[in-house]
């Protein structure tokens, strides 16, 4: 490499010497996923050849109920009868958050839904329309994320403009509702707020 110091202008050849791998706190790392599947194999005796199926099934289930530790999962893993999804989810928390795990498999979940023509279960309840229903899951941000696992054949199709817009709108509505529920006070002590919470204005206002 011709560049000798950090202040020396690098050539394109110099830059290509860097083998960068994208990573972010919002998506589980491959090492964390490997640690999770190792825990599953040791704890639940899941064969190595079905561990990927267990990951995909669990992430797909979270797309229906929300990627949160508070979400209620039902049923056994489609990968192995007798092992519940709830048990597998509990083991994830040792290594990363549920959201981080799901974000890693967002592209796989997206392809599963498109291939089976089955959108997330709560899309209508969350306010999505027919044309954007496949975006109706809370880790949709992981689709096309550089740190998320990409299927070998790529995506069946990328998200449409309508789907991207619908998801961003749903996120803003969720944030607004949360802020309205909590109020705008920075300090929540009763001595400061007198037990009151400042009102939050509407997300959309109309001219009089």
Swiss-Prot record:
Q: What is this protein called?
A: Coat protein
Q: State where the protein is found.
A: Virion
What is the protein's known function?
Required for genome encapsidation. Forms ribonucleoprotein complexes along with TGB1 helicase and viral RNA.
**What GO CC annotations are associated with the protein?**
helical viral capsid; ribonucleoprotein complex
Record has Transcription as a keyword? no
Predominant location of this chain?
A: virion
Q: What is a GO molecular function of this protein?
A: structural molecule activity
Query: Which keywords appear in this protein's UniProt record, sorted alphabetically?
Result: Capsid protein, Helical capsid protein, Ribonucleoprotein, Virion
- Record bears the keyword Membrane: no
Similarity comment text for this entry: Belongs to the potexvirus capsid protein family.
Name the Pfam families on file: Flexi_CP (PF00286)
Q: Which InterPro entries match?
A: Pltvir_coat
Domain of life where this protein originates: Viruses
